[in-house]
Amino acid sequence: MKYSKIPVARSVVALCVAKDIKHVVISPGSRNAPLTIGFTHHDEITPYSIVDERCAAFFALGLAQELKKPVALVCTSGSALLNYYPAIAEAYYSDIPLVIISADRPIERIDIGDGQTIRQKNVFENHILYSANLYSELVLENQSQDPKLQQKQFEAQKHNEREVNLALNKAIEEKGPVHINVPFYEPLYDTVENINVNPLQIFPEIKERHYSEKQLQNYANEWNRAERKMVIVGVAQPNAVEQKFLEGLATDPSVIVLTETTSNLHQEQFFTRIDTLIGPIEKDENREELFNRLQPDILLTFGGMIVSKKIKSFLRNYSPQHHWHIDSKKAYNTFFCLNKHFETDVNSFFSEFFPLTKRTESDYGSFWKDIKGKRQHRHEDYMAEIPYSDLKAMQEIYQKIPKNSVLHFGNSSTIRYAQLFEWDKSLKIYCNRGTSGIDGSVSTAVGASVSSEEPVTIITGDLSFFYDSNALWNNYIPSNFRIIILNNNGGGIFRILPGNKNSENFEKYFETTHNLKAKPICDLYNFDYEKANSEEEIQKVMKDFYSESGKPKLLEIFTPRKINDEVLLEYFNFMKS
């Protein structure tokens, strides 16, 4: 095996391997050659080569999300590093561990006019868990050199080893992005046959906080007194909560549990479609009475970001007396009423809290569960009669997604349409809701498909797909990967939002209408291409869309541009009856 002659490069590789960080996504460059040589020649590393750094970073994010362990990114100096930023922000807000390793020039070469050089030190400081800024190391050919120089080299090496340890441990312990900036002197391509470093290892400490009965008793008393308790679950990994706790919540008549498509939690009594519950009340002449009846005494939340704007608006206007959030790292005051953060994981909290609670008699659960059942019937009636549109196309897709597969959604219309359906509980569902951007949804799904044991599908809008079409520019996409595009010739989400829709400025600067089609991209990247222009054509194509194939497939569904907002808004009017 070959490794860089530069000791710090060998130490970075050795420590990544020691901490089980063995998937490394590399973008080509020269300054990062010492790292690339080491990672690509190590037999325990799985390297990936992806040219576009923005796509590479989201690819790594999808890998890490699926593997549930850190993935490393390696790039050259200069603006290459900045292209990682959108994915780093997503990882930061979604608690996904990424290790960004950037090559740099020595500090004395910064801001003197050297090429491909920017200020890389702490460049991500607002959205990073840890920034490790390493020292440059000289390659000492002759051990009899000046002892002062050798001492300086020794101190630099110890500093570097400590910083790399701290960064990697932070990614492992707290599940988020970290940045290691490694400046290199030339020559960059000299190699040695053995890794020949034994860096200091500082082992990560996974800290678990536990609450005593004394600490929880007052909260348990409040819980037991409350006749209206609402639990909301944001983004979560599949099987994140033990089933016995879900059943305990479901059987308490004073509790209703609201989940989202990305919550990956399933229990028959839960409200899986928040907007179908809230949206019709907004249109109801008795909305004040109904919202007062829905207003909880206690709001308990866990999981990541919430998609539904309707639940945010409701709880900001009808605040609970208490809002408690469970998360080992952070608690966002999403509803403007947070008054307790339980800094622990959900299962630990429930195991300590539930023994102190009791069943509370109330009609809160039964009242809203009755409405839930009625809404389901209205949903079925409405879907049976609507014209061909984005919503109708989503219904056809919903009915054909194979069980036991992984499903990704793009931002922003597709995930909001998805929220109106009750997806099969065997599916693992993801969407980049940390920052809710359109910039990396396809790349994330591609990364997930590489490491997933189940087939992966992404359902996305046209703008989100075309924005991230470089996601297909790599050699790792499996043949069972599927892309479904809802192409309504622009940003259809803006037709749903307030504003004047009948102006040239709206179409040009908000909706950004276009006539692009995905077939040329499929030809370029060797995807099978299918298209559909009607409900019947979708049904026909979907029959064989998931059949075994020699290459990945893309289905482009063309939908009307101007009818979708009317169909969606009328959905909530129809549901209130």
From Swiss-Prot:
InterPro entries the record matches: MenaQ_synth_MenD, MenD_middle, THDP-binding, Thiamin_PyroP_enz_TPP-bd_dom, TPP_enzyme_TPP-bd
Pfam family, one: TPP_enzyme_C
GO molecular function: 2-succinyl-5-enolpyruvyl-6-hydroxy-3-cyclohexene-1-carboxylic-acid synthase activity; magnesium ion binding; manganese ion binding; thiamine pyrophosphate binding
Cofactor annotation: Mg(2+); Mn(2+); thiamine diphosphate
Catalytic activity: isochorismate + 2-oxoglutarate + H(+) = 5-enolpyruvoyl-6-hydroxy-2-succinyl-cyclohex-3-ene-1-carboxylate + CO2
HAMAP family reported for this sequence: MenD
Protein name: 2-succinyl-5-enolpyruvyl-6-hydroxy-3-cyclohexene-1-carboxylate synthase
Source organism of this protein record: Christiangramia forsetii (strain DSM 17595 / CGMCC 1.15422 / KT0803)
